[in-house]
């Protein structure tokens, strides 16, 4: 069974202040006509010492954004550029969110509280700086399901409905508004480095690399890696390790992020910033989540390619500090690291003991073929074959029989017909109950089911590239 997050005292540590002058802009939060608490993450609030906040104080901090004690005195809208569908855009940054606070958890990790829908900033362009309530509900569902499936993801920390009528082209409008707070392991994006390259800010690039190496400590590069002692080279090796593992975790989860732009890539390797995400209704490498992704650039099967491409853009930015050869050597590790992560995470979700990369890769290929042939959803597939049970009469079944189970499936949870899933029809039903009847019980019931799934899957593999 999976252990619960470890509680900690409140330990403020706004380290971002050391680089705040050139990485962000102080901004005020929006003033909202209403503050109705819809979700507070009482599972993760203890990890940063905020579990004991009464609801009125919670709303004061996460709806009105009164500063937390000894933390950032004013929110910080972060500056960055980014490739959006591989077209470079220098006119972006935190357009409807900001960094609100930083604190340490029980293990000493620096965690951020950042927002979505908290008002206009210097980077809002034509946007209103707001978030729809439906978007907030979708983010709760995505982060909870990804966490259950072992993905290193941001956590939805708070959702407060704010009483405004919003107009959106991709939702029936007017629609309800909300402000969301996420708990995450940093908000430094690949696009943060791209901005410094575009502005030729070499000293700031050096400082940012040092900040990231200190704040998000990872592994040393391999002993034979060229220039392995250089900070920029070390950082790229670590980010490659993290994003290769992230790509594998999405694939094993059957998850399609939808918008893998460089401004959506956190150098800590944490999955975040959820928009038009979907879960696979069946194993299909061509499946896309975003209705506007007409070319399938960020299709399910192209997600590893997209993350490698994004690592390449980080390498381009780091050319301001390092030679090309050692950076290419770091990028060349992505493929093998991804294959290793796939084997590690695939066997974990099946609840079986790994047999080595070659055998595990053959099992994965046979499993993919089996799912495609049967038109089977990954959630149902992993549930049906957990610990090697019910092996099919095909190549996958033959290979699966040789694996030793590492988990138990004796509990009533594993005897039900199907596992908790997150297909779009159910997401829409959950939202419809809220939208039409202000009925939040389907959401709460779904979250309970998801958390039970996480407990029964047990502790996932540790994210790679982080100490």
Task: Name each model-derived stretch.
Residues 136, 166-257, 268-353:
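ATP-dependent phospho-/nucleotidyl transfer catalytic cores
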Residues 34-37, 43-54, 62-224, 268-270, ...:
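Conserved ATP-binding subdomain of kinase catalytic cores across diverse folds
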Residues 259-265:
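Hydrophobic HxD+1 residue recognition
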Residues 1-80, 289, 294-467:
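Regulatory N- and C-terminal appendages and interdomain linkers associated
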Residues 28-30, 128-130, 233-234:
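Short, contiguous strand/loop micro-motifs
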Residues 14-20, 111-122, 209-213, 282-292, ...:
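Active-site-adjacent bridging/hinge elements
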Residues 7-14, 25-28, 108-113, 174-180, ...:
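Short, functional N-terminal and low-complexity linear motifs
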């Amino acid at each position: 069974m999976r252990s619960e997050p470890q509680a900690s005292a409140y330990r403020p540590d706004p380290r971002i202040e050391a680089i705040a002058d050139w990485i962000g802009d102080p901004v005020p939060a929006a003033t909202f006509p209403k503050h109705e608490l819809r979700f507070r993450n009482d599972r993760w609030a203890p990890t940063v010492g905020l579990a004991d906040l009464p609801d009125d104080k919670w709303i004061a901090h996460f709806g009105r954004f009164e500063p937390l004690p000894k933390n950032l005195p004013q929110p910080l809208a972060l500056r960055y550029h980014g490739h959006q569908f591989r077209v470079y855009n220098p006119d972006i940054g935190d357009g409807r969110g900001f960094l609100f606070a930083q604190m340490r958890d029980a293990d000493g990790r620096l965690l951020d509280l950042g927002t979505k829908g908290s008002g206009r900033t210097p980077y809002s362009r034509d946007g209103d700086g707001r978030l729809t309530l439906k978007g907030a509900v979708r983010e709760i569902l995505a982060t909870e399901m990804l966490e259950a499936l072992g993905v290193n993801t941001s956590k939805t920390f708070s959702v407060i409905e704010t009483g405004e009528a919003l107009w959106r082209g991709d939702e029936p409008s007017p629609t309800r508004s909300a402000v969301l707070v996420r708990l995450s392991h940093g908000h430094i994006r690949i696009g943060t480095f791209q901005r410094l390259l575009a502005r030729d800010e070499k000293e700031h690039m050096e400082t940012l690399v040092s900040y990231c190496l200190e704040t998000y400590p990872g592994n040393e590069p391999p002993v034979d890696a060229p220039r392995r002692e250089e900070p920029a080279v070390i950082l790229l090796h670590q980010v490659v390790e993290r994003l290769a593992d992230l790509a594998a975790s999405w694939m094993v989860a059957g998850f399609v992020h939808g918008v893998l732009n460089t401004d959506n890539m956190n150098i800590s390797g944490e999955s975040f910033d959820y928009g038009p995400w979907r879960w696979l209704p069946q194993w299909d490498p061509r499946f896309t989540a975003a209705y506007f992704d007409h070319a399938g650039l960020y299709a399910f099967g192209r997600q590893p390619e997209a993350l490698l491409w994004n690592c390449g853009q980080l390498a381009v930015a780091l050319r301001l500090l390092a030679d090309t050869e050692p950076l290419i050597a770091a990028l060349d590790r992505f493929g093998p690291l991804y294959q290793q992560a796939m084997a590690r995470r695939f066997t974990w979700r099946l609840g079986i003991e790994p047999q080595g990369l070659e055998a595990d890769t053959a099992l994965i290929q046979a499993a993919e073929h089996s799912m495609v042939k049967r038109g089977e959803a990954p959630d149902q597939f992993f549930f049906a074959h957990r610990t090697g049970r019910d092996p099919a009469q095909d190549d996958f079944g033959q290979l699966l029989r040789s694996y030793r189970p590492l988990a138990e499936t004796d509990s009533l949870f594993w005897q039900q017909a199907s596992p908790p899933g997150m297909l779009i029809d159910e997401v829409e039903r959950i939202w419809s109950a809220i939208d039409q009847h202000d009925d939040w019980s389907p959401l709460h019931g779904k979250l309970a089911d998801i958390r039970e799934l996480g407990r029964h899957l047990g502790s996932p593999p540790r994210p790679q590239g982080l100490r």
